[in-house]
């Protein structure tokens, strides 16, 4: 993808429509917007954080945006290209529940070892609490990241080994209506 091309090559559009839940027209529209916002064709972590700040002005989304950026950045080059962007957007906005849960698992599995540890989950949950700031009133049993993580692990860590497998995470998430609802938040919006 060249610098600030306003159109994608037909073969790239075709490939992205195969790999995503977007139509050819939608891929082209998203590309136009992406190039408008990122004329270089790449989005770095600072730019990604800036976007998150627009959506969460009352908290500090920096840490969470960095975690999400790292999942979007599939090839780990420190930048998100359009292909990485549109594929992640497709899963998070239009993917099946299982696809979204696999994506969320990658977000929480910070060291990519195939497990979510208590500390990894605490890092993400703490980042979420920082991001939403005081805009959300939480119940007493979840008013700190530690309490929330304790509750999640009590529910999901069936073999009590202190880490969650993808299967434990998927089953536990599906059993918690608030998690399913959160994962479905953007359905149909994009």
From Swiss-Prot:
Cell compartments where the protein resides: Golgi apparatus; Postsynaptic density; Cytoplasm, Perinuclear region; Cytoplasm
- Extra information: Binds 3 calcium ions via the second, third and fourth EF-hand.
Record text on subunit structure and interactions: Monomer. Interacts with KCND2. Interacts in a calcium-independent manner with PI4KB. This binding competes with CALN2/CABP7 binding to PI4KB. Interacts in a calcium-dependent manner with PICK1 (via AH domain). Interacts with ARF1, ARF3, ARF5 and ARF6. Interacts with IL1RAPL1. Interacts with RIC8A; interaction is favored in the absence of Ca(2+) and myristoylation of NCS1 is not required.
On whether Membrane is a keyword of this UniProt record, the answer is: yes
Q: Where does Ca(2+) 1 bind?
A: 73, 75, 77, 79, 84
Annotated Ca(2+) 2 binding sites: 109, 111, 113, 115, 120
Q: Which residues form the EF-hand domain?
A: 24-59, 60-95, 96-131, 144-179
Function of the molecule: Neuronal calcium sensor, regulator of G protein-coupled receptor phosphorylation in a calcium dependent manner. Directly regulates GRK1 (RHOK), but not GRK2 to GRK5. Can substitute for calmodulin. Stimulates PI4KB kinase activity. Involved in long-term synaptic plasticity through its interaction with PICK1. May also play a role in neuron differentiation through inhibition of the activity of N-type voltage-gated calcium channel.
Give the UniProt entry's GO cellular component terms.
Answer: Golgi apparatus; perinuclear region of cytoplasm; plasma membrane; postsynaptic density
**Any coiled-coil regions, as ranges:** none
Lipidation feature positions (N-myristoyl glycine) = 2
Q: Topology versus the membrane, per the UniProt entry?
A: Peripheral membrane protein; Lipid-anchor
Name of the featured protein: Neuronal calcium sensor 1
| Signal peptide as annotated in the record | none
**Family per UniProt?**
Belongs to the recoverin family.
Q: Give the UniProt record's GO annotations in the biological process aspect.
A: regulation of neuron projection development
What superkingdom does the record give? Eukaryota
InterPro entries for the chain: EF-hand-dom_pair, EF_Hand_1_Ca_BS, EF_hand_dom, Recoverin
């Amino acid at each position: 993808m060249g610098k600030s091309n306003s159109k994608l090559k037909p073969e790239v559009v075709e490939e992205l429509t195969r790999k995503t839940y977007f139509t050819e027209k939608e891929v082209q529209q998203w590309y136009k917007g992406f190039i408008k916002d990122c004329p270089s064709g790449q989005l770095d972590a600072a730019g990604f954080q800036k976007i998150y700040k627009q959506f969460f002005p009352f908290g500090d989304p920096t840490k969470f945006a960095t975690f999400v950026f790292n999942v979007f950045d599939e090839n780990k080059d420190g930048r998100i290209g359009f292909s990485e962007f549109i594929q992640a957007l497709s899963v998070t906005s239009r993917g099946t529940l299982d696809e979204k849960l696999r994506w969320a698992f990658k977000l929480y599995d910070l060291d990519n070892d195939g497990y979510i540890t208590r500390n990894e989950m605490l890092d993400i949950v703490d980042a979420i609490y920082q991001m939403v700031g005081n805009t959300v009133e939480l119940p007493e049993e979840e008013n700190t990241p530690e309490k929330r993580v304790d509750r999640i692990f009590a529910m999901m860590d069936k073999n009590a080994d202190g880490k969650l497998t993808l299967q434990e995470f998927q089953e536990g998430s599906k059993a918690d209506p608030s998690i399913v609802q959160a994962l479905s938040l953007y359905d149909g919006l994009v």
